[in-house]
């Protein structure tokens, strides 16, 4: 009898662990991307970092091209890393992670997952803006940036041609999320006062 109770308890624990693992939110960012976000502590750094991750997904899907400014920035960063690599001795302790300027690491994601990554980036931006606003921080610039980003990327999303139902659903979710973010941002911009300070 005691053994049966033990087995039943173990089965219940195993089932609850399996359910919690199944119900866990899927992550559409890589560990390196999460580190990049973690390093961008304040809102003015974090919002552009999320936009960058969303743009990478749109570029990888062929919906967007890198701007000349992005290409030049990546070239300078690559040259800077090359100089630093020559100066430092590369040991396991000092080894740096691979740079995130190349989008080839996104090969591991399906098109539907890339679209979900775009959605996750928008959700994170809106959550970060809401959090900053609740702490009485200035969010006007970030709201304006979000409005511009969604306005620029929504037409690109609508050009995506899904190949199956999973991609079709992910596309619809991405378009819906972008439209909702645009509507929410428009409403927030009518409430949040304009600031006089100039952008850096």
Indicate residue ranges for each PLM-predicted region.
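Positively charged n-region of N-terminal signal peptides that target proteins for export
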Residues: 1-7
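Short, low-complexity interaction segments enriched in Ser/Thr/Pro/Gly
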Residues: 3, 22-23
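Bacterial N-terminal signal peptides
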Residues: 8-18
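Long, charged/polar, soluble alpha-helical segments
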Residues: 23-200
